[in-house]
């Protein structure tokens, strides 16, 4: 009996030691970026300045090539932690092929692009995408940088962890920017959750125009898993102050990305499906009067990943779109239906004119 008791106590003690050690390791290695820092820059040796007033954009959360049509995800009620290698390769090949076909677009704002992560098998997705877009500068800002994520504890701890992650936002641009900076969003989860979670941010690139004005392009990815929208409210307040200050200086502002919330006055359940348990928030209608929310209300941009994609039942909505300052004229905006083949998000293309 004493032997059994010692064995049980030993197992409990070992588990406690590993758990505490994991928290210490996570805390010591926690990614803690400053409020503002230069983005990782990969400029071209020779590239034109911005001269045309009519510009094209594309936004897309590529889901680290891990959330294609056949995948689900444990944090959304599914079972999978990461895809099989062949599935990841196929998802990424599809995303890369599509983006290569759109290389004439001036600006491509991408989210959930991995640089080195277990979930994407160590592939530097940003560098491979850059090779397919040889006429574009590219800039990277990390928003998910963790040495080791132990979850999920299912069926047992450390059996199938997320592991290491380094991923974030990438902006590709044909015109030459004068600067590219990462701006840290305020707010975070409490300890210890925050040491294993994303550090949300936006990636800003600036382009000189005539008359000392600038075009300010913002690539943003706002919080998910945010009960009550507390984190998103803080992020949106910061973004509002920031873009208003830029507009009041006479600059042109275009912000796009994955907002993890629907645009004002858009019915989140426009594409009604059997899965209706999701409570999707809208950005308040009075957020920025006089500014333009550019989205395609006829094409869903996001699907829920509790199960693999079923066009007949999977809940879909619009959470990927653009915000334009009053001096930017919307010419067209179009969601691109790829049937969620490569990601749980779909691209959205935009054309604008600077007034």
Model-derived features with residue positions:
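Active-site beta-strand/loop signature of hydrolases that rely on acidic residues for catalysis
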Residues: 56-62, 88, 94-122, 172, ...
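Metal-dependent phosphoester-hydrolase catalytic domains
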Residues: 2-11, 21-45, 206, 237, ...
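Solvent-exposed loop/turn segments at secondary-structure junctions
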Residues: 64-65, 113-117, 144-147, 177-178, ...
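Surface-exposed cleft-lining segments at the edges of enzyme active sites
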Residues: 79-85, 113-116, 185-194, 221-230
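N-terminal, active-site-proximal structural segment of metallo-dependent hydrolase catalytic domains
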Residues: 2-135, 140-156, 161-166
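Beta-strand-turn-beta hairpins that frame and shape the catalytic cleft
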Residues: 46-58, 66, 169-181, 197-219, ...
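Short, solvent-exposed loop/turn elements at domain surfaces
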Residues: 64-72, 181, 303-304, 332
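A well-ordered secondary-structure block
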Residues: 34-36, 147-214
């Amino acid at each position: 009996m004493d032997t059994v008791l010692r064995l049980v106590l030993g197992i409990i003690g070992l588990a406690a030691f590993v758990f505490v050690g994991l928290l210490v390791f996570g805390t010591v290695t926690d990614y803690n970026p400053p409020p503002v820092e230069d983005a990782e820059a990969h400029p071209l040796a020779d590239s034109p300045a911005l001269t045309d007033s009519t510009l094209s954009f594309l936004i897309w959360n590529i889901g680290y090539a891990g959330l294609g049509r056949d995948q689900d995800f444990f944090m959304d009620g599914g079972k999978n932690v990461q895809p099989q290698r062949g599935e990841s390769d196929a998802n990424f090949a599809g995303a890369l092929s599509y983006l290569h076909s759109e290389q004439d677009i001036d600006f491509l704002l991408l989210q959930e692009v991995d640089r080195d992560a277990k979930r994407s098998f160590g592939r530097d997705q940003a560098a491979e995408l850059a090779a397919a877009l040889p006429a574009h500068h590219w800039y990277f800002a990390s928003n998910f940088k963790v040495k080791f994520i132990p979850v999920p504890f299912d069926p047992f701890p450390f059996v199938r962890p997320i592991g290491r992650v380094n991923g974030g936002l990438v902006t590709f641009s044909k015109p030459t920017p004068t600067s590219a900076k990462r701006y840290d969003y305020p707010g975070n989860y409490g300890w210890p959750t925050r040491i294993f979670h994303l550090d949300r941010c936006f990636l800003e690139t600036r382009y000189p125009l005539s008359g000392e004005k600038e075009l300010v392009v913002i690539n943003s990815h706002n919080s998910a898993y945010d009960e009550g929208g507390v984190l998103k409210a803080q992020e949106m307040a910061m973004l509002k102050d920031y873009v208003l200050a830029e507009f009041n200086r006479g600059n042109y502002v275009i912000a796009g990305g994955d907002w993890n919330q629907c645009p004002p006055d858009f019915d989140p359940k426009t594409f009604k499906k059997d899965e209706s348990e999701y409570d999707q928030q809208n950005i308040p209608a009075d957020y920025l009067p006089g500014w333009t929310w550019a989205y395609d209300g006829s094409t869903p941009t996001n699907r829920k990943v509790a199960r693999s994609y079923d066009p007949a039942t999977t809940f879909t909505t619009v959470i990927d779109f653009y915000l334009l300052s009053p001096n930017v004229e919307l010419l067209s905006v179009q969601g691109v239906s790829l049937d969620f083949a490569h990601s749980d998000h779909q691209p959205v293309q935009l054309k604008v004119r600077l007034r």
